[in-house]
């Protein structure tokens, strides 16, 4: 039986939700920023090409951020908390940035004697750039590779290579500035920061912070247009965004054939597993074993396909648990155990847009015949 066509946007939403988990963002952060970006495109009267690039940049900005996460965790500790705090500050403000890094190191070395803690913080700050710069550069490269695997064109991939660049040139990996930063990057960076700041600080403080960063992190003309229409742009974006909304916003709806779907599932599997060295290839191996078992049971080809694809994504909910937790020797704390037990729930939500291709198994990951 021929499988029903799958919209590429469904895969984009799955990737978006997964990256929200891994980066500590609030619920439907990428989806809400996509809606905001497309509303901004409306008030700016942007053409179809610009809308297409903004749409994809908003959903996929952080898809490469699982790469080498173990290196960030080894140096800074809980990488999800670190990323959550990063979105509330202006990274171009050196004092704010250093203060955040000091907090991260103090969390990591909590319980150490004062002299050891002080030395660990000094050493961590001194060695930080040797960790951060190559890892963050790698995020851009991995994002571009994933985008290529799911069939996205070169102009979208180019924008994903600039996810940490800023208008003022204080970004990474190349320190680009002004119009050298791709237009979708400039729009989506501001939109996503607006969502995060509004969530954390409230509407009025968010407006002040966005205005203050004009000419720094953001292009001044974009800030002016955003603040002129800010009430309209953010209306209703303090809650979840449903699948139908994102599908309706897709500028050029695109369906994927069986071969493209298979590669997209593989890309998701690899994205899940790249956080830690000992999980590389895990989901592929589980999928191979599960498909072989399904074939041995005499299941029809369509069911074997569904089992294989569900196995590709079975661990997607684990992205909500920090790598520093998985890699630390010793038993989990009560809070960490609760986080680990919740990962099937997060997996089911992440896979909701893909329907039976993964949702059911994602919600039962970790279950066994013995209960």
Label every PLM stretch briefly.
Residues 2-371:
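Histidine- and acidic-residue-rich, metal-dependent catalytic cores
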């Amino acid at each position: 039986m021929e499988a029903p066509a799958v919209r590429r946007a469904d895969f984009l939403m799955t990737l978006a939700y997964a990256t929200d988990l891994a980066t500590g963002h609030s619920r439907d952060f990428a989806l809400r920023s996509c809606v905001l970006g497309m509303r901004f495109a409306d008030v700016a009267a942007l053409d179809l090409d610009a809308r297409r690039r903004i749409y994809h940049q908003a959903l996929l900005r952080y898809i490469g951020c699982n790469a080498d996460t173990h290196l960030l965790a080894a140096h800074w500790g809980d990488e999800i908390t670190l990323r959550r705090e990063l979105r509330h500050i202006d990274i171009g403000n050196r004092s704010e940035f250093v203060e955040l890094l000091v907090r991260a190191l103090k969390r990591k070395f909590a319980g150490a004697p004062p002299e050891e803690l002080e030395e660990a913080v000094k050493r961590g700050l001194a060695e930080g750039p040797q960790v951060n710069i190559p890892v963050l550069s790698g995020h851009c490269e991995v994002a571009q590779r994933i985008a290529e695997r799911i069939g996205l064109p070169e102009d979208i991939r180019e924008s994903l290579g600039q996810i940490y660049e800023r208008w003022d040139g204080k970004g990474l990996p190349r320190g680009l500035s002004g119009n050298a930063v791709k237009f979708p990057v400039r729009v989506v960076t501001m939109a996503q920061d607006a969502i995060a700041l509004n969530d954390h600080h409230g509407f009025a403080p968010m407006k002040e912070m966005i205005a203050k960063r004009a000419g720094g992190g953001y292009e001044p003309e974009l800030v002016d247009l955003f603040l002129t229409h800010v009430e309209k742009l953010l209306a209703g974006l303090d809650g979840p965004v449903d699948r139908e909304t994102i599908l309706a916003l897709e500028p050029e709806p695109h369906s994927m054939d069986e071969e493209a779907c298979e590669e997209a599932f593989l890309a998701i599997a690899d994205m899940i597993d790249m956080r830690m060295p000992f999980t590389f290839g895990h989901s592929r191996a589980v999928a191979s074993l599960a498909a072989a078992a399904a074939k041995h049971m005499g299941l029809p080809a369509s069911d074997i396909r569904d089992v294989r694809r569900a196995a590709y994504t079975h661990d997607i909910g684990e992205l909500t648990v920090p790598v520093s937790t998985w890699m630390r020797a010793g038993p989990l704390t009560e809070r960490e155990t609760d986080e680990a037990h919740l990962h099937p729930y997060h997996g089911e939500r992440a896979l909701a847009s893909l329907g039976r291709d993964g949702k059911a198994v994602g919600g039962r990951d970790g279950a066994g015949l013995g209960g």
